């Protein structure tokens, strides 16, 4: 579904990432991890079409840069790390903006938006201005907009790009949101999400991409990647890995510095 063969990616004169060779199939939730400055957001921005690259990126067999914007809209949606919240829009209007590509009526767009407001526990806030919401509520609203954008009668082979989608959420909403994202991937779609919480990545991701030293260091299952030697090398801090008693997934504990 997504084939990446990029020799290098630069911002200005600074080379940020090199040797990006990767093929990812649908039906997957893929977490992108690595320390600050490893290029996680840059990698995601490249896939969002916001940065030029040397090489090729194919989405569903077609070069990413050759897609018409309106035809790409129902196939790829992006939630940035610091998503702007335009003043003057209600929460429902923001979510309905995801339907800009469609030919449906305003009433149909509003109906879909209403459904996604409910799924993200935002119905009581639908008529409020987006700027009045807390950071976590705004984060859920922008994610609802992305999934409203990708809401099709026959879903499949769609790409959802997320940059730290749970960073401002409480524990309840972290799991509620990740459940929705996981469900979306299981319907034949591909999710790539930058994540700093390794334990959430372990619980929800099917694969993990580890970035470091300007390139991809590892691509594998959480069980294969979340090992003490790999994590200590990646994050330069002592790490202990055990197994979750119920889900048998790696659980990561870091040690404080003395």
Swiss-Prot record:
PROSITE patterns, A to Z: ABC_TRANSPORTER_2, HMUV
- Ligand binding (ATP): 34-41
Name listed for the protein in its UniProt record: Hemin import ATP-binding protein HmuV
Q: Offer a single GO CC term for the protein.
A: plasma membrane
Report the membrane topology from the UniProt record: Peripheral membrane protein
Function of this protein?
Part of the ABC transporter complex HmuTUV involved in hemin import. Responsible for energy coupling to the transport system.
Q: Could you tell me where this protein is found in the cell?
A: Cell inner membrane
Show the SUPFAM superfamilies listed in the entry: P-loop containing nucleoside triphosphate hydrolases
For this chain, one GO molecular function annotation is:
ATP hydrolysis activity
**How is this protein organized at the quaternary level?**
The complex is composed of two ATP-binding proteins (HmuV), two transmembrane proteins (HmuU) and a solute-binding protein (HmuT).
Name the family the entry cites: Belongs to the ABC transporter superfamily. Heme (hemin) importer (TC 3.A.1.14.5) family.
The record, for InterPro entries, names: AAA+_ATPase, ABC_transporter-like_ATP-bd, P-loop_NTPase
Residues in ABC transporter domain copies: 1-238
Q: What is its EC number?
A: 7.6.2.-
Protein encoded by which gene? hmuV
- Keyword vocabulary terms for this entry: ATP-binding, Cell inner membrane, Cell membrane, Membrane, Nucleotide-binding, Translocase, Transport
């Amino acid at each position: 579904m997504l084939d990446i063969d990029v020799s290098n990616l630069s911002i200005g004169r600074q080379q940020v990432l090199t040797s990006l060779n990767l093929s990812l199939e649908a039906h997957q939730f893929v977490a992108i991890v690595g320390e600050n400055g490893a290029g996680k957001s840059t990698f995601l921005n490249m896939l969002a079409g916001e940065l030029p690259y040397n090489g090729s990126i194919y989405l569903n067999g077609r070069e990413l840069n050759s897609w018409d914007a309106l035809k790409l809209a129902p196939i790829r949606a992006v939630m940035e790390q610091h998503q702007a919240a335009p003043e003057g829009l209600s929460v429902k209007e923001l979510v309905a903006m995801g339907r800009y590509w469609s030919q449906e009526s305003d009433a149909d767009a509003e109906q879909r938006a209403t459904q996604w407001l409910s799924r993200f526990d935002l119905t009581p806030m639908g008529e409020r201005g987006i700027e009045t919401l807390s950071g976590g509520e705004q984060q859920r609203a922008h994610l609802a907009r992305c999934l409203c954008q990708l809401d099709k009668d026959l879903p499949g082979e769609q790409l959802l790009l997320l940059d730290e989608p749970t960073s401002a959420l409480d524990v309840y909403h972290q799991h509620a949101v990740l459940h929705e994202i996981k469900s979306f991937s299981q319907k034949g779609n591909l999710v790539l999400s930058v994540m700093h919480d390794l334990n959430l990545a372990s619980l929800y991701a099917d694969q993990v991409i580890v970035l470091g030293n300007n390139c991809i260091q590892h691509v594998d299952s959480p069980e294969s990647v979340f090992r003490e030697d790999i994590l200590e090398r990646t994050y330069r801090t002592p790490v202990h890995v055990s197994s979750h008693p119920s889900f048998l997934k790696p659980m990561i504990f870091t040690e404080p510095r003395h």
